[in-house]
Design a protein with these regions (language model features):
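Extracytoplasmic
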Residues: 12-38, 43-47, 64, 154, ...
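Paired small-residue
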Residues: 91, 102-110, 339-347
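C-terminal transmembrane helical hairpin of 12-TM major facilitator-type secondary transporters
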Residues: 293-299, 305, 310-362
Length: 437
């Protein structure tokens, strides 16, 4: 007798992760650049001075990353993410009440600390726990919402700021972010399916037809679980050894992951300067803000396919192709024609999924099970530290040269380095067979 398959709670987790990434990474982080020019013009700050808060944001985020996987594993995920959402939204709204640089710097530190528990780490970890199948696809779907919400947010703020001012814009942004995330964290999110007495999506139990097959299947399952437990134990011991004795630092994959994350994350910082690039090219603020929307459209559109392509062709090939496409977008941003800049912004949007979608899947090639969270946190932490100065440097390049040409070239060079590192990683994977694709 066949039973109708029940709806799996993993899809609720996916919906929660979509809102989590959309309301944090999308609505706040991806829209930060819309405020740069209005704030600098109103308060007389230099671009490099204001954008230094983004460097402090990145440093604070990196400092918190080692604790994310540890806390999610040991504490109630609802409390961790809920408290982080209140801190994240509150620090964003506080910027609307600020008039001195130090206030942005203080808010940036708080915002960065909270972002580690919201923006990039929790969703891949939770989805990896809940989905045994289609992991790449669902990570990509969740990441799509950061682009979707960023696209809506940047477009909306492009009209809100001229109408009611940048101060009200910050307050609205912060309240919306916290208001969307907190209910999701409290009522929907759970760390792993075992917490609810469930199996992960795709982890199906065998259903033999007779007692003999039941016994035989039980033996096979026991043997399989023993082997998997042994592999998992070895992986966890390896990961523990890396934390205590520096074994992680001896793995080439760690350095490759750090370089890919750091360079792609730094290249993604250029997104914050796209509205200013549009103003430099003679576009009105509402039109220039659309450049961020176009970049986030490219970001969102590419995420629909990147995760699925990874499931089909492997993350190495997809990561290499995506980095070349992102590099082409950088080249188009160097031209002054508005239509070319808009096209370049859209293609440039592929830069952001390099770190938010593809790097988490890249890390799953090398670290499995409970070892994945700590390893991914370490890779993200060191990569974020590498990327952190580029927010300030990108703004300072404009202060020094009066043009965003140098900023775009440096960002493009970083993406080229991502491509070269991925090629090296591909050779490493071919030489050393790994569990998984």
């Amino acid at each position: 007798m066949e039973t109708k398959q029940k709806f799996h709670y993993a899809w609720i987790i996916l919906a929660g992760c979509c809102i989590l990434q959309g309301a944090s990474l999308g609505l706040v982080n991806n829209c930060a650049g819309v405020f740069f020019s209005p704030v600098c013009e109103d308060l007389g700050f230099e671009m490099g001075q204001l954008t230094f808060y983004r460097t402090l944001y990145a440093l604070s985020s990196a400092a918190a990353m080692p604790f994310v996987a540890w806390l999610l594993l040991r504490a109630d995920v609802r409390a961790v993410i809920g408290i982080a959402a209140l801190l994240f939204g509150g620090s964003t709204a506080f910027m609307g009440l600020s008039s001195e640089l130090w206030q942005w710097y203080a808010a940036g530190i708080l915002q960065g600390f909270a972002s580690s528990f919201l923006c990039t780490l929790p969703a891949p970890i939770l989805l990896g726990n809940w989905f045994q199948e289609k992991t790449g696809t669902v990570v990509g779907i969740a990441a799509v919402f950061s682009g979707f919400m960023g696209m809506l947010g940047s477009t909306g703020l492009g009209f809100v700021i001229p109408a009611v001012g940048w101060r009200a814009g910050y307050v609205i942004q912060g309240l919306l972010s916290a208001g969307l995330i907190v209910p999701v964290a409290v009522f929907l999110l759970r760390y792993r399916p075992e917490d609810m007495g469930l199996l992960a999506y795709g982890a199906k139990e065998a259903k033999p037809k007779n007692a003999e097959s039941w016994a035989e299947t039980g033996k096979k399952e026991k043997t399989k679980k023993t082997e998997e437990s042994g592999r998992k134990s070895e992986t966890i011991q390896s990961m523990n050894g890396s934390q205590k004795g520096g074994r992680l630092l001896s793995q080439p994959a760690f350095y490759m992951g750090v370089l890919i994350y750091g360079c792609s994350c730094a290249g993604a910082y250029l997104n914050s300067f796209l509205p200013s690039r549009g103003i430099e090219a003679g576009m009105a603020l509402s039109a220039a803000a659309m450049l961020t929307s176009l970049a986030l459209f490219g970001n969102m559109f590419s995420k629909f396919f990147l995760g699925r392509l990874c499931d089909s062709f492997g993350v190495i090939l997809v990561l290499a192709g995506a980095s070349l496409a992102a590099l082409a977008g950088h080249v188009l941003l160097l031209f002054d024609a508005p239509a070319v800049i808009m096209t370049g912004a859209c293609i440039y949007g592929i830069t952001m999924p390099l770190s938010t979608v593809l790097l988490p899947l890249f890390c799953r090639l090398f670290w499995k099970g409970d070892a994945y969270g700590p390893a991914f946190s370490c890779v993200s932490m060191v990569g974020t530290l590498i990327a952190s100065p580029f927010n300030t440097w990108f703004g300072s390049f404009y202060d020094w040269t009066g043009s965003y040409g140098l900023t775009i070239c440096v960002s493009g060079g970083l993406i080229l380095f991502v491509f070269l590192t991925v090629c090296a990683a591909g050779r490493l994977v071919r030489r050393s067979p790994l569990p998984g694709k």
